[in-house]
Protein backbone atom coordinates (compact mmCIF):
# COMPACT_ATOMS: atom_id res chain seq x y z
CA UNK A 1 0.00 0.00 0.00
CA UNK A 2 1.13 3.51 -0.79
CA UNK A 3 -1.56 5.37 1.17
CA UNK A 4 -4.12 4.76 3.88
CA UNK A 5 -7.16 7.02 3.79
CA UNK A 6 -9.31 6.76 6.87
CA UNK A 7 -12.51 8.48 7.85
CA UNK A 8 -13.55 8.85 11.46
CA UNK A 9 -16.98 8.01 12.80
CA UNK A 10 -18.98 5.68 14.99
CA UNK A 11 -20.24 2.26 13.88
CA UNK A 12 -23.93 1.44 13.88
CA UNK A 13 -26.97 2.51 11.90
CA UNK A 14 -28.09 5.09 14.43
CA UNK A 15 -24.90 7.10 13.80
CA UNK A 16 -24.80 6.81 9.99
CA UNK A 17 -25.91 10.34 9.10
CA UNK A 18 -24.77 12.14 12.24
CA UNK A 19 -22.37 15.08 12.18
CA UNK A 20 -19.64 13.05 13.89
CA UNK A 21 -19.75 10.55 11.01
CA UNK A 22 -18.70 12.98 8.27
CA UNK A 23 -15.47 10.97 7.92
CA UNK A 24 -17.32 7.69 7.40
CA UNK A 25 -19.59 9.38 4.83
CA UNK A 26 -16.48 10.59 3.00
CA UNK A 27 -15.00 7.07 2.90
CA UNK A 28 -18.29 5.71 1.53
CA UNK A 29 -18.22 8.38 -1.17
CA UNK A 30 -14.56 7.65 -2.00
CA UNK A 31 -15.40 3.94 -2.31
CA UNK A 32 -18.03 4.76 -4.94
CA UNK A 33 -15.76 7.37 -6.56
CA UNK A 34 -12.97 4.80 -7.01
CA UNK A 35 -15.32 1.85 -7.68
CA UNK A 36 -14.56 -0.29 -4.64
CA UNK A 37 -16.33 -1.50 -1.50
CA UNK A 38 -15.33 -0.96 2.11
CA UNK A 39 -16.73 -4.20 3.50
CA UNK A 40 -13.87 -6.48 4.58
CA UNK A 41 -13.20 -6.79 8.30
CA UNK A 42 -9.56 -6.10 9.17
CA UNK A 43 -7.58 -3.89 11.57
CA UNK A 44 -10.58 -3.50 13.92
CA UNK A 45 -12.38 -1.82 11.05
CA UNK A 46 -13.88 -2.14 7.60
CA UNK A 47 -11.48 -1.87 4.67
CA UNK A 48 -11.44 -1.74 0.91
CA UNK A 49 -8.69 -0.94 -1.55
CA UNK A 50 -8.13 0.42 -5.02
CA UNK A 51 -5.34 1.48 -7.32
CA UNK A 52 -5.27 4.89 -8.97
CA UNK A 53 -2.51 6.81 -10.76
CA UNK A 54 -0.14 3.93 -10.04
CA UNK A 55 -0.75 4.11 -6.29
CA UNK A 56 -2.30 1.45 -4.07
CA UNK A 57 -4.72 2.87 -1.53
CA UNK A 58 -6.43 1.35 1.50
CA UNK A 59 -9.72 2.88 2.64
CA UNK A 60 -10.38 2.30 6.36
CA UNK A 61 -13.39 2.91 8.59
CA UNK A 62 -12.36 2.13 12.19
CA UNK A 63 -15.10 0.21 14.02
CA UNK A 64 -13.66 1.06 17.44
CA UNK A 65 -15.89 4.09 18.05
CA UNK A 66 -14.50 7.57 17.62
CA UNK A 67 -12.46 7.87 20.82
CA UNK A 68 -10.42 4.72 20.07
CA UNK A 69 -9.90 5.28 16.32
CA UNK A 70 -6.13 5.20 16.73
CA UNK A 71 -6.23 1.53 17.78
CA UNK A 72 -7.55 0.52 14.36
CA UNK A 73 -5.40 2.93 12.38
CA UNK A 74 -2.10 1.97 14.05
CA UNK A 75 -2.72 -1.69 13.16
CA UNK A 76 -3.09 -0.81 9.46
CA UNK A 77 -0.16 1.63 9.52
CA UNK A 78 2.12 -0.97 11.14
CA UNK A 79 0.96 -3.80 8.87
CA UNK A 80 1.65 -1.85 5.67
CA UNK A 81 4.63 0.08 7.11
CA UNK A 82 3.02 3.38 6.09
CA UNK A 83 4.80 6.61 7.01
CA UNK A 84 2.57 9.15 8.82
CA UNK A 85 2.66 11.52 5.83
CA UNK A 86 0.98 8.78 3.73
CA UNK A 87 -1.94 8.48 6.17
CA UNK A 88 -4.82 10.83 5.33
CA UNK A 89 -7.50 11.25 8.00
CA UNK A 90 -10.91 12.71 7.14
CA UNK A 91 -13.07 13.91 10.03
CA UNK A 92 -15.69 16.35 11.26
CA UNK A 93 -14.68 19.72 12.68
CA UNK A 94 -16.85 22.09 14.73
CA UNK A 95 -14.44 24.98 14.07
CA UNK A 96 -15.89 25.44 10.57
CA UNK A 97 -19.35 26.18 9.22
CA UNK A 98 -21.27 23.28 7.72
CA UNK A 99 -19.74 22.29 4.39
CA UNK A 100 -16.40 24.08 4.72
CA UNK A 101 -13.46 21.78 3.85
CA UNK A 102 -9.84 22.34 4.86
CA UNK A 103 -6.71 20.25 4.48
CA UNK A 104 -3.43 20.51 6.34
CA UNK A 105 -0.25 18.43 6.59
CA UNK A 106 -0.15 18.17 10.39
CA UNK A 107 -1.47 19.70 13.58
CA UNK A 108 -2.80 19.23 17.08
CA UNK A 109 -5.97 17.33 17.93
CA UNK A 110 -7.96 20.58 18.22
CA UNK A 111 -10.06 18.96 20.94
CA UNK A 112 -11.20 16.13 18.64
CA UNK A 113 -11.04 12.83 20.55
CA UNK A 114 -10.62 10.70 17.43
CA UNK A 115 -7.59 12.72 16.37
CA UNK A 116 -6.29 12.64 19.94
CA UNK A 117 -6.43 8.82 19.84
CA UNK A 118 -4.56 8.71 16.52
CA UNK A 119 -1.83 11.06 17.79
CA UNK A 120 -1.42 8.92 20.92
CA UNK A 121 -1.16 5.68 18.94
CA UNK A 122 1.13 7.04 16.20
CA UNK A 123 3.25 9.11 18.57
CA UNK A 124 3.14 12.06 16.17
CA UNK A 125 0.88 14.89 14.97
CA UNK A 126 2.56 14.85 11.58
CA UNK A 127 -0.08 13.23 9.39
CA UNK A 128 -2.31 14.98 6.82
CA UNK A 129 -5.94 15.53 7.57
CA UNK A 130 -9.02 16.77 5.80
CA UNK A 131 -11.49 18.53 8.07
CA UNK A 132 -15.15 18.79 7.12
CA UNK A 133 -17.03 21.59 8.86
CA UNK A 134 -20.13 20.49 10.75
CA UNK A 135 -20.91 23.88 12.30
CA UNK A 136 -20.52 25.38 15.72
CA UNK A 137 -22.66 23.57 18.33
CA UNK A 138 -25.89 25.40 19.08
CA UNK A 139 -26.42 23.31 22.23
CA UNK A 140 -24.71 20.54 24.21
CA UNK A 141 -21.57 19.42 22.32
CA UNK A 142 -22.16 15.65 22.58
CA UNK A 143 -25.81 15.90 21.57
CA UNK A 144 -24.86 18.21 18.70
CA UNK A 145 -22.15 16.02 17.14
CA UNK A 146 -24.36 12.95 17.50
CA UNK A 147 -27.33 14.69 15.89
CA UNK A 148 -28.20 14.25 12.23
CA UNK A 149 -27.66 17.00 9.69
CA UNK A 150 -30.65 19.22 9.09
CA UNK A 151 -32.21 19.10 5.62
CA UNK A 152 -30.58 22.34 4.47
CA UNK A 153 -27.16 21.10 5.60
CA UNK A 154 -27.09 17.74 3.82
CA UNK A 155 -26.39 19.20 0.38
CA UNK A 156 -23.52 21.31 1.80
CA UNK A 157 -21.98 18.24 3.47
CA UNK A 158 -22.15 16.16 0.30
CA UNK A 159 -20.61 19.01 -1.74
CA UNK A 160 -17.84 19.17 0.88
CA UNK A 161 -17.29 15.41 0.64
CA UNK A 162 -17.18 15.66 -3.15
CA UNK A 163 -14.55 18.43 -2.89
CA UNK A 164 -12.51 16.33 -0.43
CA UNK A 165 -12.70 13.38 -2.85
CA UNK A 166 -11.50 15.51 -5.76
CA UNK A 167 -8.66 16.65 -3.51
CA UNK A 168 -7.71 13.02 -2.82
CA UNK A 169 -7.72 12.37 -6.58
CA UNK A 170 -5.36 15.34 -7.10
CA UNK A 171 -3.11 14.11 -4.28
CA UNK A 172 -2.83 10.67 -5.90
CA UNK A 173 -2.20 12.18 -9.35
CA UNK A 174 0.25 14.80 -8.15
CA UNK A 175 1.15 15.71 -4.55
CA UNK A 176 -0.21 16.98 -1.25
CA UNK A 177 0.56 20.63 -1.98
CA UNK A 178 -1.62 20.65 -5.10
CA UNK A 179 -4.37 18.82 -3.20
CA UNK A 180 -4.19 21.41 -0.41
CA UNK A 181 -4.30 24.28 -2.92
CA UNK A 182 -7.44 22.79 -4.43
CA UNK A 183 -9.19 21.97 -1.14
CA UNK A 184 -8.22 25.15 0.71
CA UNK A 185 -8.74 27.47 -2.25
CA UNK A 186 -11.49 28.21 -4.69
CA UNK A 187 -9.98 26.14 -7.50
CA UNK A 188 -12.45 24.20 -9.64
CA UNK A 189 -11.46 20.88 -11.25
UniProtKB/Swiss-Prot annotation:
Sequence positions that bind tRNA: 15, 65, 67, 113
GO terms for biological process, alphabetical: protein quality control for misfolded or incompletely synthesized proteins; rescue of stalled ribosome
Residues of the active site: 20 (proton acceptor)
Reaction(s) catalysed (UniProt annotation): an N-acyl-L-alpha-aminoacyl-tRNA + H2O = an N-acyl-L-amino acid + a tRNA + H(+)
Superkingdom of origin organism: Bacteria
Assigned protein family: Belongs to the PTH family.
HAMAP family: Pept_tRNA_hydro_bact
Subunit structure: Monomer.
NCBIfam families: pth (TIGR00447)
Protein name: Peptidyl-tRNA hydrolase
Record gene name: pth
Amino acid sequence: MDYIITGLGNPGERYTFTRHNAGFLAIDYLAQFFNTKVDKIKFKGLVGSFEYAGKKVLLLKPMTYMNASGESIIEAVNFYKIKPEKLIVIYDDIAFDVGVVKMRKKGSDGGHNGIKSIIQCLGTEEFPRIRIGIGVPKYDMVKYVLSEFEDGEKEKIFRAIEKASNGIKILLESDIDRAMNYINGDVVV
